[in-house]
Amino acid sequence: MGARVIDGRPIAGELKKRVASEVEGLAARGVRPGLATVLVGEDYAARAYERRVGGLAAELGCRYVCERLPREAEEADVLAVVGKLNADPRVSGILVLRPLPGHISEPAVFSALDPLKDIEAVHPVNAGLLALGRPRYVPSTPAACFYLLDRYLERSGRPPEEFYPRSTVVVVGRSNNVGKPAVSLGFARGAAVISCDANAYRAGRLREHTLKADALIVAAGVAGLIDESYVREGVIAVDVGINPVADPGGSGRTLLVGDLDFGSVARKAEALTPVPGGVGPITDVWLLKNTVAAGRGLASQAKARCLLRGSHAHSSLI
């Protein structure tokens, strides 16, 4: 029996219905969440992601704006855009699309975000809360990985709360937006977690680590990095890679492939995710889920401030 292919699209569809219901509930209270993206330059993957989330925001009834800057923009220009979005009451969530050009400091830009609008938890405060197990927002891609894993486990008759404490989760890649948060989420579920990156590969030890995985999350950004020699029989493999490559058939088209050598890994895996159509659709919806949560929180804060001002005005008349 071959490996099962975990299609993320129906899982994303179920999640989207829940998010749409939340948007409707907020609309009944006069609240409309708003997502803003900041795109610097013309990176292929970033532009594709911006188009997807913009379309999804419109579909769900959220406000959406993309602030586009040329690759030559100065860091001060990006910080000015972030400051403008921080102050805009119509914007509840801000996503700075990566990669940023090399002359712009990611830490400086991320630190400038309003933590309440930082829906990818890249601000130091939000990253710290996530590491402590008390996240304000869970970043969309690692959240999507575990949401997909949880749904797959449930549907195959294994409660996640029983699976993880008995299992080893291996995360390949240590990026701030995927690898490191995925490690935190694995620990939060009680799993033994192994984190490895390019250093393990250069030292010739990557295979040693990945062969221990009951669940393998690969977010290295290297097309076809993991083949069947890197995985044990029965692994559940989640591919986060989105690598644009030229069509080997010579059509001139650009194709997206993952970090798994899909056909090879499928010979040994219990289940694995495709690229595209695996983690990606869930990631998109989760970003809007965080945007809606941010909108709800900001609306509650605004209401509390109004009540407080009313209380002060009343007391001044007594």
From Swiss-Prot:
Homodimer. One of its GO terms (biological process) is methionine biosynthetic process. Its EC number is 1.5.1.5, 3.5.4.9. GO terms for molecular function: methenyltetrahydrofolate cyclohydrolase activity; methylenetetrahydrofolate dehydrogenase (NADP+) activity. GO terms for cellular component: cytosol. Pfam families: THF_DHG_CYH, THF_DHG_CYH_C. Keywords: Amino-acid biosynthesis, Histidine biosynthesis, Hydrolase, Methionine biosynthesis, Multifunctional enzyme, NADP, One-carbon metabolism, Oxidoreductase, Purine biosynthesis. It catalyses: (6R)-5,10-methylene-5,6,7,8-tetrahydrofolate + NADP(+) = (6R)-5,10-methenyltetrahydrofolate + NADPH; (6R)-5,10-methenyltetrahydrofolate + H2O = (6R)-10-formyltetrahydrofolate + H(+). NADP(+) binds at G173, R174, S175, I242. Gene3D superfamilies: Leucine Dehydrogenase, chain A, domain 1 (3.40.50.10860), NAD(P)-binding Rossmann-like Domain (3.40.50.720). This is Bifunctional protein FolD 3. Belongs to the tetrahydrofolate dehydrogenase/cyclohydrolase family. SUPFAM superfamilies: Aminoacid dehydrogenase-like, N-terminal domain, NAD(P)-binding Rossmann-fold domains. The gene is folD3. InterPro entries: Aminoacid_DH-like_N_sf (IPR046346), NAD(P)-bd_dom_sf (IPR036291), THF_DH/CycHdrlase (IPR000672), THF_DH/CycHdrlase_cat_dom (IPR020630), THF_DH/CycHdrlase_NAD-bd_dom (IPR020631). It comes from the Bacteria. Catalyzes the oxidation of 5,10-methylenetetrahydrofolate to 5,10-methenyltetrahydrofolate and then the hydrolysis of 5,10-methenyltetrahydrofolate to 10-formyltetrahydrofolate. Pathway: One-carbon metabolism; tetrahydrofolate interconversion.
